[in-house]
Amino acid sequence: MIAGLGLSTCTPSDVSIPGAATIDVMNGFPDGESGYALGVSGCYAGKLGDFLLMAGGCNFPDKPVSEGGIKHYYKGIYIARVDDSSSLRWVKAGELPMEAAYGATVSLPDRLIFIGGSNSSDRFSSVLSFSFDCMKDSGLICETLPPLPHAVDNMSATLLGDTLYVLGGNRNGIPSSSMFSLCLDNYSAGWTEVPFPGRPRVQPVCSSLLGKLYVFGGFTSGGDASVSTDGLCYHPESGQWQVVKAPLTTKGEPLTLTGGASVSYGDVLLQYENNTSWQRPSKPTL
């Protein structure tokens, strides 16, 4: 699952996806930093081999923001082996270079890539690649990839072929309609900005499917504040965009996936939005 990362906690009950899979609640949460076990928002997370890995994130450990609480950011990196058990045993495997949240994570077969993010004082353009090395004490090795041209947070990211895409979010603190690409087979060439149509999209949902890139939802704040329900499909071979029909609720109403997540499952997208309902469209419809 990609994250543009929302909340890291699961729903309180099992969720059934007809014809696809069952989503089960897993027990266990990292507790290597004071306040972390309360649950965090905006963490970096993904699956690496037989392990889940999560890092960073933020919360209000002392009191909620409505009561004047102060948001705290974290930098711990935690891993847990995935097996047949319903419990996860987390071990702290290292730390990020800085406290961070609200970035994006992309999972590759042999590594996880953490992109951008922010904390209470800074916004980041950094791109970090994590992989396993059994010769290391923690097992984790971190490599630095070319940074984004701008600091970006609250965006989404996905891998399409050998190209990494980062879309939307806040660019240097301002809601953005930017998209950047990085070829992982030639990453020394750096990032390229890809023309992106339409309004800015902060906290969009982005995924790749059948050789195309899809983006849904997102919001923009300020005087022209709005929440997007429609989607867009990008064809990398032609560089063209097409409008995609909005996903619908069970009542047939347009649904925004802002702050949610999606994952490709065969030839469908499983789309998750932040009121914990799952959508399984038969295929994205152009």
Say what each PLM segment does:
Residues M1-A3, V244:
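Terminal low-complexity, poorly structured segments
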Residues A3-I17:
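Bacterial Sec-dependent signal peptides at the C-terminal "C-region" and cleavage site
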Residues D14-L286:
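Kelch-like beta-propeller repeat domains
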